[in-house]
Amino acid sequence: MSSLFFTHFALKTIGTLGGGLSDFPWLSISILFPIASAFLIPFFPDKGEGKEVRWFALSVALITFLVTVGAYINGFDINNENVQLKESISWLPKLGLTWSVGADGISMPLILLTSFITALAVLAAWPVKFKPKLFFFLILIMDGGQIAVFAVQDMLLFFLTWELELLPVYLLLAIWGGKNRQYAATKFIIYTAGSSIFILLAALAMGFYGTEVPNFEFAHLANQNFSQNFQILCYIGLLIAFGVKLPIVPLHTWLPDAHGEATAPVHMLLAGILLKMGGYALLRFNAQLLPVAHAQFAPLLIVLGVVNIIYAALTSFAQRNLKRKIAYSSISHMGFVLIGIGSFSSLGTSGAMLQMVSHGLIGASLFFLVGATYDRTKTLKLDEMGGVGQKMRIMFALWTACSLASLALPGMSGFVSELMVFTGFVTDEVYTLPFRVVMASLAAVGVILTPIYLLSMLREIFFGKENPKLTEDRNLIDAEPREVYIIACLLLPIIGIGLYPRLVTESYLATISNLVDRDLNAVKSVPKTNIFAGNKKSQILKAPTI
């Protein structure tokens, strides 16, 4: 059966070469190419330090990135709210399983982000000398798998691609992690694999709902008239599963441990891509496919988002371990995604999308710098890092730029995304004014804490009490050209989006507006309460056109 599938896919690819580029199977290639290429790595010689493997993996990652860019340029219409670049091949018809991929405004920016971050993660992994063949094999498997998560249009296939990420991440943590790597890897697999059962149960329930012949395609599920109780049950299960990945407090405890043991390239993939899978899935399934349940649970998302922002910011402030400090900072920033998804405004939901893209870039940059700093100082304790600013001036400049981006400095992407979320939620008349004021005021506390713990962190690392073992170490070198290049590649879109957010927002505005209208119609089923003001038309504000 699988051979027939790949034969069909190959014939279809050849058949489209004579047609327009919009008919080219861009997404299937971007998924299958890195995965297929990964299986060529075992044939590379074991001699040396893996130089050939590194260049091969980088070439594959760059080609994959160019393929996704080609998909966006040649086949994606930003004004079309529907799924585009659609490819559908019947795979296992008796099980209702179809190779169905496509992209709309919600998935396309994250597909581009995935291929971009992965290419930089491969470059960040250049110093890896231990088992380089296995390391880059796993990275390329993750590349194709993560793109598939955002591209598939079949819920059962989504579950399979979601699970595809578990083993590579587990091995990357367990083999190349720190002293407690086994504990961190085991905790990751227990949390993510355990919660994934809810995705499978929801997929089977939704696919078999009201029919004997299962159909798991998103388009079919979106048109199903699911009962309210059925939607609520599925919503709760999916919220738990996606809440682990986002992560939502209190389902977050695996993340600081994973980040505490991971290497820099794995950091970049965790913070830059893996967390975004949770936010994307909440939009795709909870908000889009289960609108009636979403209308009832949206206030809970707002509250959970505020808890994320405040709790994680306070915890980050108290951390003395550099990796864990940045990890909790990531959890705090993902709280804005929850608030945006819980809002019923186009502006707020657009802000959530932009926050995912923005944090993907900023989180990857900060964690790469954490790894680069650890490689030099051999410590993660802030108390032992003081006084290296004089010897690492370029590194200090890179840290400063990325920290300013993380604290949402105007002119950088984080500022625009957080402003959109705040404005969208506060101006959303679906919620009562007291609820909006209280939630926005509490979230503002987290915003105030962010520059405090980030700037104090910078001071402690570079200009704190001097550690003679570091300041007198002749091997303590400044940033290398490769490291400067990686940060420059990340800062360029961070600043570009901050100055002109329409670079990203235009790609998903049509899809987001359609999703919000769908959710607003579901608000009619929710009675007026101290939280809901009733069925008032939310202001469908568009993204700023700076």
Swiss-Prot record:
Main location: membrane
Lineage: superkingdom: Bacteria
Catalytic activity line of the entry: a plastoquinone + NADH + (n+1) H(+)(in) = a plastoquinol + NAD(+) + n H(+)(out); a plastoquinone + NADPH + (n+1) H(+)(in) = a plastoquinol + NADP(+) + n H(+)(out)
Name of the top EC class for this enzyme: translocase
Pfam families given in the database record: Proton_antipo_M
GO BP terms: ATP synthesis coupled electron transport; electron transport coupled proton transport
UniProt topology in membrane: Multi-pass membrane protein
Originating species: Prochlorococcus marinus (strain MIT 9515)
NCBIfam families xref list: NDH_I_M, PRK02546.1, PRK12561.1
GO terms, molecular function: NADH dehydrogenase (ubiquinone) activity; ubiquinone binding
Similarity section: Belongs to the complex I subunit 4 family.
Residues passing through the membrane, by range: 24-44, 56-76, 106-126, 132-152, 156-176, 188-208, 232-252, 263-283, 297-317, 326-346, 352-372, 396-416, 437-457, 484-504
InterPro entries hit by this protein: NADH_Q_OxRdtase_chain4, NADH_Q_OxRdtase_chainM/4, NADH_UbQ_OxRdtase, ND/Mrp_TM
Gene Ontology cellular component annotations, sorted alphabetically: plasma membrane-derived thylakoid membrane
Keyword set, alphabetical order: Membrane, NAD, NADP, Plastoquinone, Quinone, Thylakoid, Translocase, Transmembrane, Transmembrane helix
Protein name: NAD(P)H-quinone oxidoreductase chain 4
Subcellular location(s) per record: Cellular thylakoid membrane
Enzyme Commission numbers on file: 7.1.1.-
Role: NDH-1 shuttles electrons from NAD(P)H, via FMN and iron-sulfur (Fe-S) centers, to quinones in the respiratory chain. The immediate electron acceptor for the enzyme in this species is believed to be plastoquinone. Couples the redox reaction to proton translocation (for every two electrons transferred, four hydrogen ions are translocated across the cytoplasmic membrane), and thus conserves the redox energy in a proton gradient.
